[in-house]
């Protein structure tokens, strides 16, 4: 959400991906983002996706999944996603290079680098479907879910 407007599609565009690591490396941006993300999770359970969620934002979360996959597979998936949304200009090689650049920048940045939390469960989804990934995550989270009848 941005100023009350749904922007999930827009933030997944390649032109945004090219700047994410650079902006995220800024200490002031990191501090404010962590503050806002923590505020969102204060009053209710939340599922959050991000490269430092389990280490900086919700270090005490009951369930943490560290998702990984073969870089080539990640690039192919991202390429297909972009193509399905009408981006016919980008090449698979450009997507691969973008992901490699982001991974390097995020793992080597000073503020909240991308690392696996010691207590995170590794989910290598290289050969898993989305449904298999969801089932894995639900199985790990189920003991912590409190559902009101």
Tell where the protein language model's regions lie, with residue ranges.
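Small-molecule kinase domains that catalyze NTP-dependent phosphoryl transfer to phosphate-bearing small molecules
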Residues: 37-43, 51, 55-56, 60, ...
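A ubiquitous short alpha-helical element
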Residues: 2, 63-67, 123
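Short, glycine- and charge-enriched coil/turn segments that flank and shape catalytic ligand pockets
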Residues: 83-93, 145-149
């Amino acid at each position: 959400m941005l100023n009350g407007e749904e922007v999930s599609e827009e933030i997944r565009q390649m032109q945004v991906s090219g700047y994410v690591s650079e902006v995220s490396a800024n200490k002031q941006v990191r501090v404010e983002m962590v503050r806002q993300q923590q505020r969102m999770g204060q009053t209710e359970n939340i599922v959050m996706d991000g490269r430092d969620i389990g280490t900086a934002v919700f270090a005490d979360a009951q369930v943490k999944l560290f998702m990984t996959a073969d870089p080539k597979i990640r690039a192919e998936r991202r390429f297909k996603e972009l193509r399905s949304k009408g981006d016919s200009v980008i090449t698979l090689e450009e997507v691969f290079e973008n992901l490699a650049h982001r991974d390097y920048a995020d793992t080597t940045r000073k503020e909240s680098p991308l690392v696996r939390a010691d207590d995170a469960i590794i989910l290598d989804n290289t050969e898993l479907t989305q449904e298999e990934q969801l089932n894995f995550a639900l199985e790990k989270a189920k003991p912590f879910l409190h559902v009101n009848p």
